């Protein structure tokens, strides 16, 4: 199943090293393909370096795409991470 959702970055420093690591670790156990799109650039969200290269700042809208058998669960986990400011 393929799901798409827009999420806003709420933490002060945007998608820097700590949030990128949180996201990559969160996605380690998922079988779904996960990508983020920001400013017409789409990246593999399981890659810390790719997330960092987006250079997404606070209040940026990220389009999250999840495609796979565990898409609902994976999307919910990503949403919670964004809502909780990646634990910051």
Residue spans of the language-model regions?
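Intrinsic-disorder/low-complexity, polar/charged segments enriched in Ser/Thr/Lys/Arg/Asp/Glu/Gln
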Residues: 2-6, 61
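C-terminal structural segments of small proteins and small subunits
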Residues: 53-88
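Compact, glycine-rich, soluble single-domain proteins
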Residues: 8-49, 54-57
